[in-house]
Amino acid sequence: MNPLTRRDIIAHQASVPWPHQRQVEQDLLLCRAMAALFNDTFLRGQIAMRGGTLLHKIHLAPAVRYSEDIDLVVFGNRPEDHVAKAIRRVLKPEFGAPTDSIWDTIRLAIRNTVRPSRVLRLTYSVASVIEPGASLDIVVEANVTERVPHRPVVAIPFAFAFREATIAAQVNGYDIHEMLGTKLRALFQ
């Protein structure tokens, strides 16, 4: 995809309620990441989206809550490292390589030990167009343990305007009932 410009971010501001251009920029980056992930043939057969970004950007659009990450669940039968390599391959043209932090690695190792599910986390640090010298973090997390969903994965249309075109994807995800149930469960945990 083409690098973002200040004009792209200002144009995207018309479609989101965020008061700060930095948030608008990060929202546009998330949109581009979602489209890239779910327009990839391999990943489309392996991952589904869940979490607040799916809930607010697709089910409850226009979004009323700001999102900073993409939560995925791996439902396909390919090994975790194949999925991780594919995510890196697909997002590299957009964000470069994910950043490595010893503290993030330690936190994730503790999290994966304490909780019954295992998570793969990739954090991308992207130079901001709106605030030169600053960076935006895009976090992609994939649960690699919960491979058999309680309810069926559904293809949900997702699209956003970018320059003179509309970028679209069929995002694998869960219906609104499953999403609200998941959020309610998280509140009680």
Predicted regions and their residues:
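Compositionally biased terminal segments of proteins
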Residues: 1-189
